């Protein structure tokens, strides 16, 4: 209000009854509250102080309903402008009109008289900050630069009041959770924090801390059929051998047979002989120390321009790079293998030469160094290799040909090809395609890759060599490049990168916290968010470790930090926004009511979003991968704890912040004003030039902040709602196609790229890293690696009986393998079993997948026909007449043998084979410690070659499975529990990742639907949210496929959490839509976007920054985590904002459609909970079409203005009138009938399709924002409009506030009705002249049930002539700009404020005043522009104990936004007592 305005009011004007809704109230006396100066003091002696005024509560309860009063009454009394301590009123001698006297002295200088009354006893202090209703008092020298720009339309001085109220202390029992939070915030916050801290401490101190030494542990499947069989087969091999529970031979027979002892010793003697022969071969050349092997460090070379490495230049380059890059460092000499050379009596130790192509060619040509090679020698060596390569590729040339050149396969190999150098070059040093079967005939074969084996074993000691000489250095020389390497330090280097790159996750977390701080302008809330996340994670670790008894803690569990920070970001933004919205009420409600309102809506949103996210995180529990299951349990528990804790720390933090911010601002404000409040205007600038720079910088920041705020308001209050609603057809089609395309890409073609290696060699660094290139590309290019992995080798099929396939270890601990379980029902000695096992041999050999043995292959590799071998062995044994055939297994025994004879003969045959060295290496029988047969293992080769192709391996597995199940069903009783296993570990991992990842995603979507249905009880909204979440998840997975991500355990873990990360944003819109104060779909959609658009976009933008920040990380875990968070949050934001809202535009629930109602709670829910489906029907006379909630009971209450409801805005108002005491006329009720009734319930008319050409659209740019924050204005009006409880309470316990007193561009005589002119008491000219300087506008709180289209106006009889006062244009505009913060944004909340048809033309200005009819548009409909700045009421209340004696019949004028446009006359006949 301008300082020059004059306050005019009746002498006997009444203050509103400040009774609360909790019970009856007593009209309390007005408190003497000292005025607080709004201007800086001139000196220290004139500093304004705020003195608390103690108000003693009545300690004695009375039976009278008017015996008690609350802090709510006190705060409302303090908030009224006329109740303040002010100078005495001047009384006009002519008309008796009173006006407050104006003083030139700041009110703050009058406080000294009251300072002595400040109480020193413990008291409760309530603060009320509301716009000042008093004229601003400023000194002549003002420090305007400290307050920023004072725009008349935006700036309103704020007056701080402090009231001290004594309460009953500990004897007062809180009635609700919000009351506990408001009265004891510090106690509640500290108590909950201590509980969580105690749990965290217990989790840390109980047992060992997590071990991250093996970051890749736990990414293998556990619990599947194949994994259980592979684990059992592994344990069977581990438990077989000397000194172990099982043995391949009966130990009783081996102890008696000396041949067995000699044979047992023959194997190590054979190895020693081979080692001596290899040493003798190397000693002839006197060059290499040993043979190359996979235990040595390896470097892969390739030509830069794809040229062949088989050239003298390339060979020189490889030798040179080895010398400069590897051997030049002093650390290499300490780690390399050393060979001793004797020079006379001296011994010289030097590093062994590397196994490189150049050195082998030097050996073949009998030269000392690779630098001495010539082109001719290189060509001759190529010819030798070309000649010997076919023998290598057909399997004839093997490593043993050097030792046994005349036996077995080596007999056909030429002598000059039996050199170890030929085999080692082809086997180790060159790629598989060099001189292969397809390229051996090429004239100039191409050598693409070549390996160099360093004489250093793989170990962590090579870490320094890599970091000092290889990482970050140029690895190219003469167009030859080192592109891959395997130094055995991949795991250690990964942990090194994790530690070095940890700065990126820290920066990402800080980005989320800074986003919270900047958005909410509170570092305290950001710090509390971090504390809440830490306590939630540590408490979840306590439950993870103590309650769930899980010992394995994978490294990726730490990624839950970003998930919880994002959850805290969403919770804090929505909660604090709504809290600030409650504070923007004029005046704000008491803290208890505000907190109760915020917890009802935002607490509900937090619970719905948090519970849904937590349960979807738990969906990863159904996965078979251990790390994914552990991550699901930990993240789900942490999210649940964080959700529950958010309902404690968020409200407590806001109460504490509000409580202590007032004290700090008052203390700091006085000190901050001293340097600049000098008598000399230039004193501020003369103090220091640094202050001018700081002031300029601060002004720039303010300007930037205001510009950003205006842009945000324009985007999220206008552009985004209009864009979503008007282009909903495009959005729903576009995102539907995006979801369908993502589903097709991720599930059908091409699908996620499955891993080509087991989990131990998973990708840890970027694809361009030399370690990753070796594992992904070069490992499959060399024959020694391919043979080690069994690639392109026939797969072995193993059939096992006697052992139960079980995994009785802890499935949540990869190190817990369990024990071996023996089948007690195993019996292979029965007659039926012997016959079935004999027939099984022929059945296997007749299968298409069986690979028969060649004549050159060792029969020990295949024991499928061991029964036939036993029959043959028994038949060739000759027994004498004195010998017992059954005891010595002679030829006189017919088959099938008696069970005891079968076991004895079988044991003897195995002992004889073992003595001869023909015992199968892996198959055969397993004997227990007593010599009995405990298990049977049958192994044979198949025609299927080992492959990484999932489809090929799946076809082979299904073929074997169907055949084996068919055969085992016909087996005798003792053999029916057999099972098979093969090299299916990679296939099992691929199968789990390809199927279970999609199953987890689908299950999480189903859980989303279930949880939303349980929390919202609305089927359509739950379905739409589930569709949006599913589309977001599959679109994200489709984008990951397009980014060529390989589906490993890490990726599966991320995808399992995708639904939980996507549901937050959709839940925000869903709850906001269901609580919107609109009955039509489009209005609810616009409301939810305006309310939640900014927090959702801010959260998505914060995660976008997180992804960008983590991109430079070398560790692939951080990079993928950042990319995944970026994609899933941005895609979820798009689907929530555009797809979900578009679905609601088309099929959003209304009129209770889809809502599950329980009969026992229907009545209560309709009274206390905001209904998401209005009962409004198109074409009915219902003001709810304009965006207001129903105020009464029931979900289908209609608020109309016809005689049926007796002309009341709310149903409860009728009952309220009935309770009024009889006396005088009822106050007149006036309203704008054409805007409130008979409007179509459509968002189209209120947004973009208004038929009124001159009226601006609700979402158009013609609307001018008023107030400090348009977004707060909009939110305040919309929140107040949707509170049915507050509306009901206001009508029951509050008095009607005063009517709006304003000016009109019409003349005085045009505003009064002739028949009422004689009844009015006219003010004198002096009073009228004083009133032209300004007007007193009552600033009262908007009722929560009122909206801009439901304006109820009452008028007292003694202020009638004030309506006839006219003002100048500039005075009129200042009034409109300085009114309460209920700005024209309230119109945006209305669904339908435009007119549906055009009335008659504008009447001429010369017509008499009789033609202007009250309650009608008076022919100005096409130019009507309303600027409803304040919802106004009459302060006089019949319930206050005094009855008004007269009522004015003059209609109320609602001013137009432009002075040249006509005002609107509105009038509605009030109902008397009888009529009500």
From Swiss-Prot:
Single GO biological process annotation from the record: smoothened signaling pathway
Top-level division of the source organism's lineage: Eukaryota
Major localization class: membrane
InterPro entries documented for this protein: Dispatched_Hh_regulator, SSD
UniProt subcellular location: Membrane
UniProt-annotated stretches for the region Disordered: 1-84, 1447-1476
GO cellular component: membrane
Domain SSD: residue ranges: 495-656
Membrane-crossing residue ranges in chain numbering: 185-205, 506-526, 528-548, 550-570, 602-622, 635-655, 729-749, 1000-1020, 1023-1043, 1047-1067, 1098-1118, 1121-1141
Basic and acidic residues biased stretches: 1465-1476
Membrane topology qualifier: Multi-pass membrane protein
Glycosylated sites: 58, 366, 478-479, 817, 827, 846, 1245, 1339, 1391
Name of this chain's protein: Protein dispatched homolog 2
Gene: disp2
């Amino acid at each position: 209000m301008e300082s020059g305005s004059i306050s005019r009011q009746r002498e006997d004007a009444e203050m509103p009854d400040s009774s609360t809704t909790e019970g009856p109230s007593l009209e309390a006396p007005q408190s003497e509250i000292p005025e607080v100066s709004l201007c800086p003091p001139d000196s220290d002696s004139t500093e304004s102080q705020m003195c608390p005024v103690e108000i003693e509560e009545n300690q004695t309860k009375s039976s009278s309903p008017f015996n008690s009063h609350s802090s709510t009454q006190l705060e409302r009394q303090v908030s009224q402008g006329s109740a303040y301590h002010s100078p005495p009123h001047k009384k006009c001698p002519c008309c008796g009109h009173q006006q407050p006297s104006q003083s030139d002295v700041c009110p703050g200088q009058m406080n000294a008289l009251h300072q002595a009354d400040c109480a020193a006893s413990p008291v409760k202090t309530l603060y009320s900050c509301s716009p000042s209703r008093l004229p601003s008092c400023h000194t002549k020298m003002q420090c305007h630069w400290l307050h920023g720009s004072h725009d008349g339309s935006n700036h309103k001085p704020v007056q701080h009041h402090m009231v001290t109220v004594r309460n009953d202390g500990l004897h007062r029992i809180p009635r609700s959770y919000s009351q506990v939070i408001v009265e004891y915030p510090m106690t509640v916050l500290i108590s909950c924090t201590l509980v969580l801290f105690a749990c965290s401490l217990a989790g840390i101190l109980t047992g060992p801390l997590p071990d991250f030494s093996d970051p890749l542990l736990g990414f293998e499947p556990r619990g599947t059929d194949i994994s259980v069989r592979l684990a059992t087969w592994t344990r069977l091999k581990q438990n077989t051998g000397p000194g172990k529970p099982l043995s391949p031979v009966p130990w009783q027979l081996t102890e008696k047979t000396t041949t067995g002892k000699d044979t047992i010793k023959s194997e190590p003697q054979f190895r020693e002989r081979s080692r001596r022969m290899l040493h003798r071969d190397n000693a002839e050349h006197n060059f290499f120390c040993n043979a190359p092997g996979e235990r040595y460090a390896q470097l892969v070379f390739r030509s830069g321009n794809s040229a062949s490495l088989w050239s003298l230049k390339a060979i020189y380059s490889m030798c040179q790079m080895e010398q400069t890059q590897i051997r030049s460092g002093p650390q290499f000499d300490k780690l390399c293998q050393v060979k001793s050379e004797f020079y006379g009596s001296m011994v010289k130790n030097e590093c062994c030469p590397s196994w490189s192509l150049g050195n082998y060619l030097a050996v073949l040509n009998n030269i000392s160094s690779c630098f001495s090679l010539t082109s001719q020698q290189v060509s001759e060596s190529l010819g030798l290799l070309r000649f010997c390569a076919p023998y290598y590729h057909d399997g004839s040339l093997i490593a043993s040909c050097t030792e046994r050149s005349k036996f077995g396969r080596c007999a056909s190999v030429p002598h000059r090809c039996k050199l170890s150098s030929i085999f080692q070059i082809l086997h180790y040093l060159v790629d598989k395609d060099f001189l292969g079967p397809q390229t051996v005939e090429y004239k100039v074969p191409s050598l693409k890759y070549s390996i160099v084996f360093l004489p250093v074993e793989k170990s962590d000691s090579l870490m320094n060599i890599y970091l000092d000489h290889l990482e970050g250095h140029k690895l190219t020389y003469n167009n030859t490049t080192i592109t891959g390497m395997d130094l055995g330090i991949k795991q250690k280097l990964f942990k090194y990168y994790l530690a070095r790159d940890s700065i990126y996750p820290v920066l990402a977390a800080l980005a989320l916290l800074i986003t919270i701080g900047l958005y909410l302008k509170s570092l305290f809330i950001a710090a509390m968010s971090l504390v809440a996340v830490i306590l939630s994670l540590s408490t979840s670790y306590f439950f993870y470790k103590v309650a769930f008894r899980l010992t394995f803690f994978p490294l990726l569990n730490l990624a839950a930090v970003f998930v919880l920070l994002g959850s805290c970001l969403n919770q804090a933004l929505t909660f604090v926004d709504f809290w600030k919205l409650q504070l923007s009420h004029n005046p704000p409600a008491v803290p208890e009511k505000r907190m109760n309102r915020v917890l009802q809506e935002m607490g509900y949103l937090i619970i719905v979003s948090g519970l849904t996210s937590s349960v979807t995180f738990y969906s990863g529990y159904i996965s078979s991968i251990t790390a994914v299951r552990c991550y699901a349990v930990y993240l789900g528990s942490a999210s649940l704890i964080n959700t529950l804790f958010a309902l404690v720390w968020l409200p407590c933090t806001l109460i504490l912040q509000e409580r202590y911010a007032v004290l700090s601002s008052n203390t700091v404000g006085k000190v901050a004003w001293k340097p600049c409040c000098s008598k000399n205007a230039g004193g501020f600038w003369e103090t220091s030039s640094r202050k001018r720079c700081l002031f300029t910088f601060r002004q720039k920041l303010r300007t930037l902040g205001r510009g950003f705020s205006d842009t945000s308001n324009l985007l999220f209050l206008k552009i985004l709602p209009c864009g979503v609603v008007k282009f909903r057809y495009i959005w729903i089609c576009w995102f539907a196609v995006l979801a369908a395309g993502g589903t097709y890409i991720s599930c059908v073609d091409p699908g996620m790229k499955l891993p080509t290696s087991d989990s131990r060699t998973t990708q840890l660094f970027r694809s361009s890293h030399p370690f990753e290139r070796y594992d992904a590309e070069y490992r499959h290019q060399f024959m020694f690696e391919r043979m080690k992995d069994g690639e392109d080798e026939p797969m072995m099929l193993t059939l096992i009986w006697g052992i139960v396939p079980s995994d009785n270890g802890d499935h949540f601990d990869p190190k817990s393998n369990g024990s071996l379980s023996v089948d007690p029902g195993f019996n292979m000695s029965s007659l039926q079993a012997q016959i079935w096992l004999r027939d099984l041999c022929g059945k296997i050999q007749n299968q298409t997948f069986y690979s028969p043995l060649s004549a050159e292959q060792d029969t020990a590799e295949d024991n499928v026909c061991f029964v036939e071998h036993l029959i043959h062995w028994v038949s060739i044994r000759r027994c004498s007449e004195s010998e017992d055939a059954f005891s010595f297994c002679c030829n006189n025994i017919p088959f099938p043998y008696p069970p005891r004879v079968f076991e004895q003969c079988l044991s003897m045959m195995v002992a004889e084979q073992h003595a001869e060295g023909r015992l199968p290496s892996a198959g055969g029988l397993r004997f227990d410690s007593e010599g009995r047969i405990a298990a049977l293992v049958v192994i044979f080769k198949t025609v299927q070659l080992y492959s990484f192709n999932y489809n090929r391996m799946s076809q082979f597995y299904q073929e074997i499975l169907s055949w084996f199940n068919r055969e085992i069903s016909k087996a005798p009783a003792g053999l029916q529990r057999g099972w098979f296993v093969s090299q299916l570990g990679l296939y099992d991992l691929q199968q789990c990742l390809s199927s279970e990842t999609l199953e987890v995603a689908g299950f999480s979507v189903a859980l989303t639907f279930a949880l939303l249905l349980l929390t919202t009880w609305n089927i359509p909204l739950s379905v739409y949210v589930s569709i949006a979440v599913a589309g977001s998840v599959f679109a994200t997975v489709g984008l990951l496929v397009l980014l060529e991500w390989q589906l490993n355990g890490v990726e599966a873990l991320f995808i399992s959490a995708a639904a939980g990360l996507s549901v937050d944003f959709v839940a925000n819109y869903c709850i906001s839509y269901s609580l919107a104060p609109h009955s039509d779909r489009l209005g609810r959609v616009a409301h939810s976007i305006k309310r939640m658009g900014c927090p959702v976009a801010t959260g998505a933008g914060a995660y976008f920054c997180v992804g960008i920040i983590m991109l430079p990380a070398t560790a692939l875990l951080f990079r993928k985590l950042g990319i995944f968070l970026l994609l899933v949050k941005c895609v979820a934001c798009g689907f929530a904002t555009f797809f979900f809202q578009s679905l609601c535009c088309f099929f959003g629930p209304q009129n209770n459609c889809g809502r599950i109602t329980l009969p026992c709670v229907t009545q209560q829910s309709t009274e206390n909970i905001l209904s998401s489906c209005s009962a409004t029907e198109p074409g009915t006379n219902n003001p709810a079409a304009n965006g207001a909630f129903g105020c009464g009971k029931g979900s289908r209450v209609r608020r109309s203005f016809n005689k049926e409801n007796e002309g009341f805005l709310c149903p409860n108002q009728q009952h309220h009138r009935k309770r009024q005491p009889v006396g005088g006329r009822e106050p007149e009720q006036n309203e704008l009938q054409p805007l409130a009734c008979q409007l179509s319930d459509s968002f189209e008319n209120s947004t973009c399709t208004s038929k009124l050409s001159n009226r601006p659209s609700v979402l158009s740019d013609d609307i001018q924002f008023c107030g400090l924050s348009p977004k707060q204005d909009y939110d305040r009006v919309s929140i107040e409009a949707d509170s049915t409880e507050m509306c009901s309470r206001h009508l029951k316990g509050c008095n009607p506030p005063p009517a709006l007193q304003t000016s009109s561009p019409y003349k005085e005589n045009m505003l009064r009705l002739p028949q009422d002119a004689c009844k009015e008491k006219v003010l004198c000219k002096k009073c009228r002249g004083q009133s032209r300087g300004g007007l007193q506008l009552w600033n009262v709180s908007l009722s929560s049930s009122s909206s801009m289209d439901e304006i109820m106006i009452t008028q007292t009889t003694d202020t009638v002539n004030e309506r006839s006062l006219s003002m100048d244009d500039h005075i009129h505009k200042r009034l409109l700009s300085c009114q309460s913060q209920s700005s024209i944004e309230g119109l945006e909340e209305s669904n339908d404020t435009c007119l549906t048809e055009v009335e008659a033309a504008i009447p001429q200005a010369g017509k008499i005043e009789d033609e202007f009819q009250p309650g009608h548009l008076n022919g100005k409909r096409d130019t009507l522009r309303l600027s409803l700045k304040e919802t106004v009421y009459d302060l006089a209340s019949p319930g206050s104990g005094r009855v008004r004696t007269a009522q004015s019949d003059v209609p109320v004028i609602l001013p137009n936004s432009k002075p040249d446009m006509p005002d609107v006359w509105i009038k509605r006949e009030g109902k008397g007592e009888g009529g009500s």
